[in-house]
Amino acid sequence: MFGLINIGFGNVIAGDRIVAIVNPESAPLKRLKEDAKEEGKLIDATYGRKTRAILISDSNHIILSAIQPETIAQRFMQSFFEIEEQLERIRRKG
C-alpha cells in the first residue's frame, strides 16, 4: 500500500503500480527501454537529464527518472510508513 511517490521535477507516480526500480546501465535494460519507446510505453520524466533509474509498472510502462534508484526506494518506504501510521491512528479511534 503506497501513495503517490515523487520521482523528481514535480513528477509523481502511483506507488502501488510500480513493480521494480532498477539501474539503467545494463544492456538488457537498455533494450527494454528501446522496446518500450517503439511500443509507445516509454515515459521520460528526466527533463533532459541523465537517466539514473528505470521504473517498471504493472502495465509494462517504462518510466525514466533522473533520481537514483536508492532515493526513490527510500521515498517508497517513507510513504509506506506514513500510510501505516495513519491507518494505526484510525484503528485506535474506531
Curated annotation (Swiss-Prot):
Pfam families: RemA-like
InterPro entries, per the entry: RemA-like
Record-linked HAMAP family: RemA (MF_01503)
NCBIfam families in the cross-refs: PRK04323.1
Family named by the database record: Belongs to the RemA family.
PANTHER family: REGULATORY PROTEIN SSL2874-RELATED, REGULATORY PROTEIN TM_1690-RELATED
Name assigned to this protein: Putative regulatory protein Tmel_0100
Lineage of source species: Bacteria, Thermotogati, Thermotogota, Thermotogae, Thermotogales
